[in-house]
Amino acid sequence: QVLYGGKDLRRFGRKEFARLVSILPQTRDVPSIRAEQLVAHGRYPHLSFGRDLTQADREKIAWAMEVTGTTALKDKELSQLSGGERQRVYLAMTLSQDTDILFLDEPTTYLDIGQKYEMLELIGQVNAMGKTVVMVLHDLPLAFSYSHQVVVLEKGRLAAQGPADQVFASGVPARVFGVKSQ
């Protein structure tokens, strides 16, 4: 059970939930739209039926594209983008939604090693803005380097939870994932 303000998240309506939580799934469709149009989709939970984007919405979209380094891609079709560029555009959409909580499932998917570090630094900056970031990362060194708190699951059950350094030192991740830790 996950609570927000004492209320089970499953009890929120879709639009209400989307105003609180933005989600970046690991795999997504690639619609035939321009990058900026996709980023604008993050603003839809904040719009009334039939209402157009406001200047404030456009500013959030521009900000999200700027911080993710995707402004130069705004007029390109998603299908024309590399996997890494597309991943950053999807993160921009998630940021333009302007929620307090971000769920990111493997946000470094499709990124080369340099882009992975850039993405995680950016996510750290988002967290420093006061946003709660929950990430799924299977790259253990990255997970332990870029997370304040870590949860380790084993066969769907909680195996360890706590500050990253303490969970790492516990040896649980090494046992669960069958790797040696140093």
Q: What does each of the following model-derived ranges do?
A:
Residues 1-7, 17:
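Conserved ABC transporter NBD signature motif
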Residues 40, 55-73, 98:
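Conserved ABC ATPase "signature" region
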Residues 137-138:
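H-loop/switch region of ABC-family ATPase nucleotide-binding domains
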Residues 143-145:
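A short, surface-exposed alpha-helical micro-motif characterized by mixed small hydrophobic
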